[in-house]
Amino acid sequence: LARAARALPRAFADGSDLAARTDMSLASLFGGLALANAGLGAVHGFAGPLGGMFDAPHGAVCAALLAPVTAANLSALATRAPESPALARYREAARIVTGDPAATAPDLVPWLLDLVRRLGIPRLGHYGIGPADFAAIAGKASQASSMKGNPIGLTPEELMRVLAEAQ
C-alpha cells in the first residue's frame, strides 16, 4: 500500500520513471495476491454489474467507487459494528497512504478523493450512469458474490448513496 501510494502519482506524472513503474508493477502483483486471498468487497460488487450494464472500464469504475464505498463502510462500521477490526485496518491504511502516524480511518476518504482527482479518473456519470440507473445497479450489486467480502453489509440506501457520491 505504501509503495503504491508513493509510486502511482509519480508513474502517472512521468511514464518514463522506471522506478515508479516498477513499484507499481509490484504493488499490482501484491494487490492481486491480496485480493485473491482476502476476498473482494463492495467496490467489486458494484463493478461487475456496472461493467455488464455500461461500457465503462473496470479499473476506472473501481477507482471512482473506492472513496464512496470507503466512506459508506466507515459510517456503517462506526454505527453498527464499532468494535470491528476493519476499523483498525482502515485506520492503518490511512496512516500508510497519508504518511501521518496520527491519521484516522476517515482521513482515508479525502486522500482517495484527491488521488482520483489528480489522476483525472472520470466519475460514473462520464459513462452515462445516472440516478435513473441506481436502483437496478444497487439491486444487482447487492446480489454480487463480491459483496460477501465487504467488512459490513450495506443497506440498499447506503448502496444508493455510494452511487450518488460516485456519479
Task: Give the ranges of each region predicted by the language model.
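Carboxylate- and glycine-rich phosphate/diphosphate-binding segment that chelates Mg2+/Mn2+
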Residues: 1-38, 151
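Predominant activation on well-ordered alpha-helical scaffold segments within soluble catalytic domains
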Residues: 1-9, 25-29, 43, 47, ...
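Charged/polar positions within long, soluble alpha-helices
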Residues: 9, 33-36, 40, 71, ...
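Intrinsically disordered or highly flexible coil/loop and linker segments, enriched in small
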Residues: 17, 34-40, 102, 121, ...
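Short, solvent-exposed positions on alpha-helices
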Residues: 18-22, 41, 60, 132
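Glycine-rich phosphate/pyrophosphate-binding beta-alpha loops
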Residues: 29-62, 144-149
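Gly/Pro-rich interdomain helix-loop hinge
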Residues: 53-56, 60-133
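Short, amphipathic C-terminal "tail helix"
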Residues: 130-167
